Curated annotation (Swiss-Prot):
It is a multi-pass membrane protein. The chain crosses the membrane at residues 4-24, 50-70. Its main location: plastid. InterPro entries: SecG. It comes from the Eukaryota. It comes from Pyropia yezoensis (Susabi-nori). Belongs to the SecG family. Keywords: Chloroplast, Membrane, Plastid, Protein transport, Thylakoid, Translocation, Transmembrane, Transmembrane helix, Transport. This is Probable protein-export membrane protein secG.
Length: 71
């Protein structure tokens, strides 16, 4: 049972790291001068979906961490 939990824990860790890394930065800074405006509805819905996936895997990671630590 512990092997299965650790497999899901490692998988959720990798997916969580990946989803965090593919997020767009919130601040635009000087690098956006002259850049195109990216406030299309498609971009917003993709960002919202990515946020939900990130939170889901964060909760899963923390839950599995707690379960593995207790057992």
């Amino acid at each position: 049972m512990e092997q299965i939990l650790k497999f899901f824990w490692y998988s959720s860790t990798i997916i969580l790291i990946f989803t965090i890394l593919i997020h767009n930065p919130k601040s635009e800074g000087l690098g956006s001068v002259g850049a195109q405006n990216q406030f299309f509805s498609n971009t917003r819905s993709t960002e919202n979906t990515l946020n939900k996936i990130t939170w889901l895997f964060l909760v899963l990671f923390l839950l599995l961490t707690t379960i593995i630590a207790v057992s």
